[in-house]
Swiss-Prot record:
Membrane topology label: Multi-pass membrane protein
Record InterPro entries: CobS (IPR003805)
Domain of life: Bacteria
A Gene Ontology cellular-component term: plasma membrane
Pathway where this protein functions: Cofactor biosynthesis; adenosylcobalamin biosynthesis; adenosylcobalamin from cob(II)yrinate a,c-diamide: step 7/7
UniProt source species: Nitratidesulfovibrio vulgaris (strain ATCC 29579 / DSM 644 / CCUG 34227 / NCIMB 8303 / VKM B-1760 / Hildenborough)
Subcellular location: Cell inner membrane
EC number: 2.7.8.26
Signal is among the record's keywords: no
Lineage: Bacteria, Pseudomonadati, Thermodesulfobacteriota, Desulfovibrionia, Desulfovibrionales
The protein's name in its UniProt record: Adenosylcobinamide-GDP ribazoletransferase
Purpose: Joins adenosylcobinamide-GDP and alpha-ribazole to generate adenosylcobalamin (Ado-cobalamin). Also synthesizes adenosylcobalamin 5'-phosphate from adenosylcobinamide-GDP and alpha-ribazole 5'-phosphate.
Top-level EC class as recorded in UniProt: transferase
UniProt similarity note: Belongs to the CobS family.
Catalytic activity: alpha-ribazole + adenosylcob(III)inamide-GDP = adenosylcob(III)alamin + GMP + H(+); alpha-ribazole 5'-phosphate + adenosylcob(III)inamide-GDP = adenosylcob(III)alamin 5'-phosphate + GMP + H(+)
Length: 245
């Protein structure tokens, strides 16, 4: 199998359940990072297709709920686990080792619940408006932008020693990966939203990435929870911004 195809399948297998997980070396995992936007395209396509075929047509509220459900199933809810964990750790105002203890605790607290409610609520509202407007292409663009933003976040933070996944993602976020992520995200937005909406979305996603990078540098490390929160936050931003544009 060609190396590039192995890395592409590795990225899709890691970020979705639609491709079987693959055995990989540390170098392979790092090389797969530049294929994260492709994994976003796979997620977006899987979420878009049922509705393009007419699932629950003329019932936008039901379509929006089904969209959230399908998105969760396709991604195994991987990114939302990061939202809950990071909300608990950040919301507690803890720093240092205590921050990481809370972040790695599998139990969910009040801040985690609030983070999930806000995140799911935003995703549902944004999707509902998208279904009303009929601009289903945004459903494809959102996951591409989210995973591209994750790559850029990894490029802004020193790898640290807190997490193997964080270290490998940071190692893979080289200039090529950044260029691919930025180009794919920009094209996805320009093809599905007005120019002003594209600018607004990029600005808000940039603020999310910057805030997460600042927190990661403050706490001297980054892990998969940061990545998941970045993906979920930027994906939701695309839906909400497009619904108002």
């Amino acid at each position: 199998m060609p190396t590039f195809l192995h890395h592409a399948l590795l990225a899709c297998g890691f970020l979705t359940r639609l491709v079987p997980a693959r055995v990989a070396t540390a170098d392979d995992m790092a090389a797969a990072v530049r294929w994260f936007p492709l994994a976003g395209l796979v997620v977006g396509g899987a979420c878009w297709l049922p509705f393009a075929l007419g699932l629950a047509a003329s019932h936008p509220a039901i379509q929006a709920w089904l969209y959230v459900l399908i998105n969760l199933w396709v991604t195994r809810g991987l990114h939302w686990d990061g939202v809950a964990d990071l909300a608990d750790a950040w919301g507690s105002s803890a720093t240092g080792e205590r921050f990481w203890d809370i972040l790695k605790d599998s139990r969910i607290g009040a801040f985690g619940v609030m983070g999930l409610l806000l995140g799911f609520g935003g995703q549902y509202i944004g999707a509902h408006e998208i279904f009303i407007s009929g601009r289903l292409g945004v459903l494809i663009a959102a996951p591409i932008v989210g995973r591209g933003a994750c790559v850029i976040l990894a490029a802004l933070v020193p790898p640290g020693s807190r997490s193997t996944l964080g270290r490998l993602t940071c190692a893979g976020a080289d200039r090529i990966a950044i260029g691919v992520a930025a180009t794919c995200g920009m094209l996805a937005l320009l093809l599905t939203t007005p120019a002003i909406t594209t600018v607004t979305t990029i600005a808000i996603c940039g603020a999310i990435v910057t805030a997460l990078a600042h927190l990661a540098r403050r706490e001297d490390g980054i892990n998969g929870d940061f990545m998941g929160a970045c993906i979920a936050g930027c994906e939701g931003t695309v839906l909400l911004a497009a619904s108002m544009g």
